C-alpha cells in the first residue's frame, strides 16, 4: 500500500501531467487553427477565390498547373468567396460589373464558398457552353432537391429518365398541335381579364400584377389538368404554395456552398421546404386520385397522359407529383412577369403604344375581338415583345445554371468537372459591342426589313436567348411566347394604358427566381373597344 508521501508525489505528478496535457491540447488547437487560416488565406489569393485556389493548388501539387489556363475573376473573401455577388437582388448587374472590372466578359471565374463557378457575358462563349454535351446537367440545390424538382424536367440528371420526361412533355403539352388545342382556354381567360379590367375605375390606378399571376396560374392548371381551376375558391392556397416555392428556389442557400453550415440550416430554408412539400403532396395527390376515379378510355389531359404510361415510361406516383408540381410552378411566373414589363414600357412610351394599337386596328379592327391567328400579322407588336425580352429578360442568368460532368475546354481555358457554369443573358443583351444603343428601348431593331430573316429569340441566336439554348432549353418556350403575345395584344387592343400620376414609371427591378418589377405597375385604363 502506498504511503501518504508516495500518494502525494503521485498526485503531484498526475497533476503536472494533466497540466501538460491541457497545455499541449491548447497549443495543438491553436496550431491547427493557424494552419487552417493560413491555408484558407493562401487558397483565397488565387484568381477566382478559394474554391478555385483549392483546385489550382491541387494541380500545382500534381505538377499539371499551367498559368495560361487560369481564368480571371474576383477573389471575394476567405472561405465564402464571392457569395455577395449572388446574394443581391441585382446579381446579374453585379456579375456584369465584376466581369467588366476584371476584363473577363468572355469568361470569369468566382467562388461561391466551396463551389467553383464560371460565367460568361459573351454570346459566342454562351453558345459554346449551352450547346456542349459536357454541360447537359444542372447543379441540384438543396431546395430544388427538397421540393422534388430533381425528379422533374428542370433538374433531373441528363439521361434516359430525363429524355423520357422531355419527350412526354414535348408531345403532350408543348407541341404545336397541343398549343393550338389550348387556344380556346387562353381566349376564355383573356375575356375574363378584360371583364375584370372593365370593372376598374378609370379614376383609380389599376395594379395588374395579381390579375396576371392569377390568369397565368389558371392557364397552366387548364393545360395540365384539362379543366378550369376554381380560382375563386382555392387560388389563395395554391398561390401561397407557388409563391413560397419561388422564394425558396430563388434564394441563394449558403449550405449548398458551405457544407459545414448544413447542420444548422441558418436561413431556415430546409425547415420551410419541409413545411411546403406535404402541402404540395396533398394538393397534387388529390387531383391524381380524382383522375384515377374518372372513367374513359382516351387521355383527356396531361395528368391522364402520365397515368396511362406503361413499360419503361411508367412513372411512380412521387415522380408524377414532381412533374406536375414543376409544370404548375414554372408555367405561372414568366408569363406574368414579362407582360407586366411590356405594359410598363407601353405606359412609358405612349407613342410606341399608339403604333401597336394602330397595327391592331388595321389587322383586327375595332368591330371584333382579337384572335390568335391575327398574331402572325403583327410584326411591330412582336418586335416590342422581343425588345422587352432584351431589356428585361425574366431569367437574366438563364434562371438555372449548368454543371460540367467532365473536364472540358471553354474559350481555350480548362474547366474542371463539377464546375457550375452560368450565362449572364442580361449582360449580353446590354452589351454595346453586341447591340447598338443597348440602353434605349427601340423595338424597330427587331422589325425585319424586306429580304431579311426575322430575329429568333427561341435559342438559335445567343445574342438574345431568354429561353436558353441547347439540350436544356425551356421546353415550354413556344407556349409561353404565344401566351404573352396573345394576352398583350388583347390588353392593348381593348384598353389604352396611361400613367397613374405624373411621376412616370418605376423600372427598378428585383431578381427572385425571375427578374420582376421591384414595385407593381400602377396604370390608368381607358376602354378603346366597346
From Swiss-Prot:
EC number assigned by the record: 1.14.-.-
Deletion consequences: Reduced seed size.
SUPFAM superfamilies named among the record's database cross-references: Cytochrome P450 (SSF48264)
Bilayer disposition of the protein: Single-pass membrane protein
Keywords of this entry: Developmental protein, Growth regulation, Heme, Iron, Membrane, Metal-binding, Monooxygenase, Oxidoreductase, Transmembrane, Transmembrane helix
One GO cellular component, as annotated: membrane
Note: The gain of function mutants eod3-1D (T-DNA tagging) show increased size of leaves, flowers and seeds, but defects in reproductive development.
Family under the similarity heading: Belongs to the cytochrome P450 family.
Protein name as catalogued: Cytochrome P450 78A6
Species name: Arabidopsis thaliana
Lineage, highest ranks first: Eukaryota, Viridiplantae, Streptophyta, Embryophyta, Tracheophyta
